[in-house]
Structure formats: structure tokens, C-alpha cells
Amino acid sequence: MTDTDTTTTIYTHEEVAQHTTHDDLWVILNGKVYNISNYIDEHPGGEEVILDCAGTDATEAFDDIGHSDEAHEILEKLYIGNLKGAKIVEAKHAQSFSTEEDSGINFPLIAVGVFLAAFGVYYYKTNFA
């Protein structure tokens, strides 16, 4: 482990790989190293999913879940340094439920609505007129 400046510690893959137990657990996320030993018992998904990624780059697994902003805030407190040679990238935050693609009018829903309205008019005219 070496210091590139007074605030950031740089770790190698080998150093991170030595921290794989419940009481001493590190992971790599987006080129950053996190000591999540004190958080593992609080993890909503259970400790098994974290232990499966212990000592490795867990970026893909973390991003696939789509963690909340709160999860990212917790990570900030667990950050201990950067991975040697890694390009630091911003973590992907969970997508909101509404995207540009699905925020428009939903055609099948409109078609059903038009059908029901037409049926209602037909039913009214044949039974009450």
C-alpha cells in the first residue's frame, strides 16, 4: 500500500483479496476500495451476497442490483482508498421508474379505454334508448 498524496491510499488487487471474512471484508466498486466489515450485518440483502464478492471487484454485481441513493451515501462512509491502476468512474445510481421511453402515452391502455367507452355507448343506446 502506498500513498499518492496525503488523503488517498492506493491498494492492489492482492491487498484487497486478503480481506474476505465477515469481520474483515473489503470490496472494489468502480475503482474504489471499501471496507464494509462494519456494515455487513445491516445489509438488507443479507450477508451472503456480500461474502460472495468479498475481496474482489463487485462493481457489476452492485450495479446490476440498482442500489438506491441511500446505499451510495452509506458507501461514501466506508471508502478507504483507490485501486492501483484503476480508472475511477462514477457509480451508477438506480434508474427512476419513469424514463423518456415510457413517460409518453401508453397506446394499448388508450385502445382499451376507447373500446370500453364505445362499448358503454353501444350498451346504453341498446338498453336505455
UniProtKB/Swiss-Prot annotation:
Designated name of the protein: Cytochrome b5
One cellular component term from this protein's GO annotations in UniProt: endoplasmic reticulum membrane
InterPro entries associated with the record: Cyt_B5-like_heme/steroid-bd, Cyt_B5-like_heme/steroid_sf, Cyt_B5_heme-BS, Cytochrome_b5
Gene name linked to the record: Cytb5
Topological type in the membrane: Single-pass membrane protein
Occurrences of domain Cytochrome b5 heme-binding (ranges): 8-84
Single GO term (MF): metal ion binding
Cellular localization per UniProt: Endoplasmic reticulum membrane; Microsome membrane
PROSITE patterns in UniProt: CYTOCHROME_B5_1, CYTOCHROME_B5_2
PANTHER family: CYTOCHROME B5
Main localization category: endoplasmic reticulum
Gene source species: Candida tropicalis
BP terms from Gene Ontology: sterol biosynthetic process
SUPFAM superfamilies: Cytochrome b5-like heme/steroid binding domain (SSF55856)
Keyword RNA-binding: no
Function statement: Membrane bound hemoprotein which function as an electron carrier for several membrane bound oxygenases.
Family statement drawn from the similarity comment of this UniProt entry: Belongs to the cytochrome b5 family.
Pfam families to which the protein is assigned, alphabetical: Cyt-b5
Transmembrane segments: 104-124
Keywords assigned: Electron transport, Endoplasmic reticulum, Heme, Iron, Membrane, Metal-binding, Microsome, Transmembrane, Transmembrane helix, Transport
Positions contributing to heme binding: 43, 67
